Amino acid sequence: MAQITPELVQQAYDALASGDREQIRKYWADDMIWLVPGHNPLSGWKQGLDGFLGFMQEVGRLSGNSFHMDREAIMISSDASADVTRNIGNRAGDEARKLDINVIHYLRWRDGKVIEGRGAIFGDGTAQYDAFWS
């Protein structure tokens, strides 16, 4: 069993940001699941790596590829990690429509790969998140 470290978590996100599927598969399991919070068209469970990557592509499309996460902290346990991020972006075609929220991503790991992820949004960020993606 691979040890979860802050470096491993960062490498997983770096692979995801690269868009290189071969690199992504080193850290994200093919049978992973991901829960997108809120009540908007993107919300709900994403099944498998393809479902998750499809969600990420839609985030890029809707934000004109402006969406990014500034990682503030990473916490780890034997089979899970939680990272605190500031998620920022603006809606494609509407520069005034901005997203700026604080989020925790809770990740469960198996054999060095993410098998489950869930997002949690702080404070009034949930309303902002829903309005941004709706």
Where does each model-flagged region fall?
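Short, low-complexity N-terminal intrinsically disordered segments enriched in polar/charged residues
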Residues: M1-D30, F132-S134
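Hydrophobic alpha-helical core bundles mediating ligand binding, dimerization, or RNAP-core interactions
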Residues: V9, Y13-L16, W28, M56, ...
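Hydrophobic pocket/interface hotspot
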Residues: V9-A12, Q23-R25, M32, G48, ...
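A solvent-exposed, acidic/Ser-Thr-rich amphipathic alpha-helical stretch
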Residues: Q23-D79, G125
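Short, cysteine-centered beta-strand-loop-beta hairpins and adjacent loop/turn segments enriched
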Residues: G64-N65, G89-L99
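Hydrophobic/aromatic beta-strand elements that line small-molecule binding cavities or substrate pockets
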Residues: M69-M75, I88, N102-R108, G119
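A short hydrophobic beta-strand element
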Residues: S77-N87
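Low-complexity, intrinsically disordered terminal/linker segments enriched in charged
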Residues: E116-S134
